């Protein structure tokens, strides 16, 4: 996605750039494991979180000034069985 150079992901996270309030907040809800990873409902849970962020309704998890949100979800084993990979980008209009 181009957030940092190859190999710089660790230092980026260590500097706090992926935390709430950082330059690129990642998983402010705690991610899929914090939700019990409900498999079939995973994508919907991700979209719900992103919608809450864009509406400014995420409470203590709120990312300040959220205008664009990216969701990635996949299922199955690509190349071995039927699988799917989806990337959704949501953007606040006003």
Model-predicted regions and their roles:
Residues 1-94:
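Claisen-condensing/thiolase-fold acyl-transfer catalytic domains that form or cleave C-C bonds
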């Amino acid at each position: 996605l181009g957030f940092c150079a190859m190999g710089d992901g660790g230092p980026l996270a260590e500097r706090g750039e992926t935390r709430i309030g950082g330059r690129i907040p990642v998983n402010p809800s705690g991610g899929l494991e914090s939700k019990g990873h409900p498999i079939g409902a995973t994508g919907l849970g991700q979209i719900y979180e992103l919608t809450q962020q864009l509406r400014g309704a995420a409470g203590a998890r709120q990312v300040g000034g959220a205008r664009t949100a990216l969701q990635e979800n996949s299922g199955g084993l690509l190349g071995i069985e039927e699988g799917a990979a989806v990337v959704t980008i949501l953007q606040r209009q006003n």
